């Protein structure tokens, strides 16, 4: 799609649209995605004719630095100014990132809600995106092996650090054991009650996620958690919970290969569990369902405060705009006002341009009073 100059002309409506750059974009990027997110934000910024300054997380700064070096090399190779893509100098600090957000024309923030709030308080126009914590339902009509394979592929991508990774699954009672068996065939490990408590006590320490265990590959995760020897050969780890807890419980975002499993008596309870999980973390972001019953999918969409409800998809890949769905490609998913965001969409190139509308007159098409008020008058009288 064209994003600079005249991008559309509609003579019948007397409307011509020009796309213009927003200016300098400040892109705050998370430690959990220190390479792909900077590239994604730089691509969208450049497509609108902007320059971008990337603020890395201190924990991911080395990876982001190398990523920016590679982008600058490609810009130079293609005859464009390298400084269209810049990086805050090391060592990066909160104060430096804050000053960048104060001075740019548009701040685009992926990361903690604290980062989003600081950007919004800077006085700069800000696009923030919501926290993930995706719960996914497996209902009684689902193709269990297909669902399990998709959940596995999505869960293990980047060791489950994606905001769109399945953090919990809710399985209907009448297919519960069959679904667990399918997940085991796909590569899952079913933790014992003792192992579940070991995972719980290791994953959260001091009231927060233990940074030493998140984003670890499966063999390392199994060893750190003290799981049975055979667990080291598995791909992800299922912990079964009887109810939804609060923050710093298995209902929260885990950024690891731990997958919480809930059992629901029926579909109504499954929907209630999903809403309870999102109330802990992730409201506005997304949920999903594996089903052959589209009425169930539509019910979930109607009754859940999220921007995205994916049907029969690997959540990590579909949420960001897969080749088999119509969502815009992105690595940053806004959550609407439910998540405190101004955007209710996937972050995409349209967010990085301003539009000028050239408006000329057209033949008047003025509605009559009857057209405007007729249905009201018919029902309630004049």
How would you describe each model-predicted region?
Residues 100-103, 143, 203-211, 250, ...:
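Short, surface-exposed amphipathic charged segments that create phosphate/polyanion-binding patches used
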